Amino acid sequence: MSDNVSQLQPQKKPGLGKRIAAFVLLAVLVAGGVAAYVFRDQLNLDALQRYVRYLNVSDDSKSGRFLYDESNSNQYAGLSGGLAVASATGLSLYDKDGTETASIQAAMSVPVLKTGNTVALAYDAGGTVLEAASQKKGSVLHVSSQRAILDADIAADDSICYLSSEPGYKSVLYVYNSQQSLIYRWLSASQYFMRCAVASGSKYAAAAVLGQQDGMFESSVVLFRTDSEEILSTIPIGNALIYDLHFLPGNTICVLCEDALYFYDLDGQCLGSYAFEDAYLKDYTLDGTGSVTLVMNLYKAGNRYTVLTIGYDGTMLGALPTSEQILDISASGRYLTLLTSGSLAIYDQTLKEYDVSDNTTGASSAVMREDGSAILLANGH
């Protein structure tokens, strides 16, 4: 026998009982896997994740409460499972247990708040202050502009852009990468930029332009590559005001106008649209994944609302009529929360009700979280 070959001892075969038990266990696992696939739309995996995540929060604990200075000008948004608050006195961040992790002092007459992945962006609309902060690092960007800040945006990877002006120029677009370093500046001496957006990766940016032709105002969207000195493309919109811009996954840009919602690629080709027809846009959110949420009203006043979710190809995914006053909407991931005068309800993207609570006394705002839970904000907490 060769020295480098080991002699193998014959192994004992497992008993019949053990083999049967192993077979039954395997069958159960296979059946469970098949059931999980077949009924994947009905299984509430987010509920399980929330249960595991919040096991350490007892009913009598104060964990999960967010204490802040209340003001009618406050703006709220979710951040990393916690909360971001922009107020007249600055920007505050809280983790998922309600512990304040950052507090940036800044005077803001009209605070506007947006969040990315780990960074919250707050600025004073029409003022000169912009702040960005994360829960782990605190302040990551401070801008004190000599001219008014007209708009700002933050991408899913925390890239940032904002609009202002400089002497001799009508508009200036500034773009920062995900490490909040300034990488691009576009100066326009001939055009007024009204809105801006930046894509994840900070390779692309966009600005809504208000111009004039034949005595009538004309809107357009200008697309930029931040590694080029030339305009990438210009998308004509027509004589409709542009309310908002937002880059979607795959570098699709969403353009929200006063009369319609559009989706374009970087070449300016329209990928889909949804016309408002005779309804009036009352509120909206471009947050969430896979859809845009619109609150429409049949009249300029009154409570004849219809909540719509629109897919990125312009297809209506769901519609929810309601006669209750809508106080706030918020979206994150696959979920949407709707706060009315009578309840707080959570829906999926097709507006199928997921959960509802009638205990909303004193509530003025709500923040949807990606795991399917929501933060209800009232009376400073």
Feature-to-residue mapping (PLM):
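Acidic, serine/threonine- and glycine-rich low-complexity intrinsically disordered segments
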Residues: L187-Y312
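Hydrophobic beta-strand positions that form the internal "hydrophobic ladder"
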Residues: L83, A120, S159-C161, S202-A205, ...
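Repeated scaffold domains used in trafficking and secretory/extracellular systems
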Residues: R65-A77, A106-T118, R147-A156, S190-S200, ...
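Non-cytosolic head/periplasmic domains of membrane-anchored proteins
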Residues: A102-A208, G215
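A short beta-strand motif characteristic of beta-propeller blades
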Residues: R53-Y68, D97-Q105, K137-S144, S181-L187, ...
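Structural motif
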Residues: R40-D41, G90-S92, T128-A132, G168-Y174, ...
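N-terminal Lys/Arg-rich, disordered targeting/topogenic segments
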Residues: M1-R19
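Hydrophobic membrane-insertion alpha-helices, especially the h-region
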Residues: I20-Y37
